[in-house]
Amino acid sequence: VIAHLKGREKLLEHIGFPRQQGEWVTLVCLHSGLFTRDQLAFYLQGANRFYVRRCVKALLDCRVSSRLIADERVIDGRLICRIFGKQISEVLEIPHTRHRRETSLEVIRRRLLSLDFVLDHLELPWLPTEQEKVSCFEQLGIERDLLPRRIYAGRAKGLIHYFPLKTPVAVGPEAAVFVYVDPGMGTRTELDSWGEAHRRLWEKLRESGRRVEVVAVAWEQKLLDRAGRRLRSWVASEMSDNEKEALMLRQAIAETDFDTIESYGGFDAVVEMILRWDRKSPVPKDRGSIDSFRLWGSHRCRRIGDRLTK
C-alpha cells in the first residue's frame, strides 16, 4: 500500500485496473502525467518487457466514457506514454488540469525526473497535489503568502497557483523534503530563483522544529555537480552540542514549555545557562536557509551515453 495515494487507486477497480496497475496509473496522474516503459518496469519490480508491453497496451486501449485516456509517442528520443484523459482525473477525484495537457520538452523532462525520484522513495509522506501542499502548510500555521506561487495574466488574469513547478514535496513530523529538478535546459540562476521562492516557507518550517532538506535531481552529472556547488552555500553551519542545547532552551522559553524549563532548574537557571554559552561562542553561526541537501541522478531517465556517479 502506498500511503500518499490515500486509497485513490481503488477508484479505478470498476474500470478494469487491477490493484498494482491502478496504483501505477494513480502515481502517474498525481506526479507527472507521463512515464517511460523503463519506469513502469522498475515499479513492476523488474518485470520482463513482454509483461510491461501488455500493461502499456491495456492502458492505451482503456476507454472511460467511451474515450481513450492515454497515448504513446517518441519524444526526446524516448517512447513516452502520456495519460491525458479528463475522465480518468475525474474518477481519481484530482484536478484534471494537473498534468494532462501537452507541454514543452523542458516540462516533460522535469515531470519524468520528478516521477523517477518518487518511485525510488515511495515511503516518504508526499503531498502530490497543490491543494494537499497548501492545506498541510496552513495546518502548520504557515500563511499562503509565504508559499511559492505564480500569478497568471491574460485570460487567467489574477489566477494564483501555488508550487507552480509541481515538483515533489514531502512533509513529516521531523523533516520536510523539497525536490529541485534540473531538466538541463535552463540557466544557472534557476536554482537560486527556486530557492528564493521557498525561502520564507523554509524559515517557518525550521522555526517549527522541522529540518529542511533539498534534493537536487538531474539526468546529467554536470548538472548535479553545479547544483551541489550552489547548495553547499545554503546549508547551515554545524552547531556544537552546547549551541544546539541553547537553541532548544530558547525555543522552550518562547513556547512556555514549563516541563523542559523545570528540568533544567527553572527559568533563572535556563537564562543563565544560555548567557554562559553565548559568552563562550560570541560569533553567531550562520543558520543558512536549509539544514542539508542531497544529489540524486536518474539512471532511468539519463541522457543516452551519459555516465552518472553512483
Please provide the spans of the model-predicted regions.
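Basic, Lys/Arg-rich alpha-helical nucleic-acid-recognition elements, primarily the DNA-binding modules
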Residues: 1-92
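Hydrophobic, Leu/Ile/Phe/Ala-enriched alpha-helical segments that form helix-helix packing faces
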Residues: 28, 44, 56-63, 117-125, ...
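Glycine-rich, often proline-containing surface loops adjacent to acidic residues and nearby aromatics
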Residues: 34-37, 89-100, 173-180, 211-213
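Short, amphipathic alpha-helical interaction segments positioned at domain boundaries
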Residues: 81-109
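Exposed, interaction-prone assembly regions rather than primary DNA-binding/catalytic cores
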Residues: 101-193
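Hydrophobic beta-strand segments of well-ordered beta-sheets in folded domains
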Residues: 168, 173-180, 206-219, 272, ...
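Catalytic cores of nucleic-acid endonucleases
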Residues: 181-239
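Non-catalytic C-terminal interaction segments of nucleic acid-processing enzymes
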Residues: 222-310
